[in-house]
A protein has these predicted regions:
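Active-site region of the double-stranded beta-helix
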Residues: 1-82, 93-129
Length: 129
């Protein structure tokens, strides 16, 4: 698990559980330098509501964004003085909204996860080659 304490400023976090990894455009090859990261810019999901932007978008990006748009996700803004808990194996996309400083703490790994959201096994069986 990970705790993020925002000291100053604000950041937007989009969190998605392990069971959704197949919808998130995750790089699955262990030798790849961006292994377990997504190739998608989740900030572009809003472009799917604009027909002009959709026409300009490469088809592969549009298809992946449409798929990512169906994933279960939590969208929140963490502001100065707030703490965000990120469960083990959850994927997170972060956008700075202001100049900010944060403190992160990791504490162990929960391999079993949650009956509703999944855990480490969902990541290794569903996303990792």
């Amino acid at each position: 698990m990970k705790m993020v304490g925002m000291i100053t400023g604000a950041k937007r976090y989009i969190l998605s559980p392990p069971r959704e990894c197949s919808k998130l455009g995750i790089v699955t090859e262990r030798q790849n330098p961006i292994f377990r990261h997504s190739l998608l810019n989740f900030g572009h999901l809003v472009h799917l509501d604009d027909p002009t932007k959709v026409e300009e978008m490469p088809e592969e990006e549009r298809l992946w964004l449409e798929r990512a748009g169906t994933a279960t996700a939590l969208d929140t803004v963490v502001k100065a003085g707030e703490v965000l808990y990120i469960p083990s194996h959850w994927f997170h996309y972060i956008t700075s909204l202001q100049k900010s400083a944060q403190c992160n703490v990791r504490s162990g790994v929960d391999f079993e996860g949650d009956i509703h959201f999944g855990g480490g096994e969902d990541v290794t069986s569903g996303c990792v080659i």
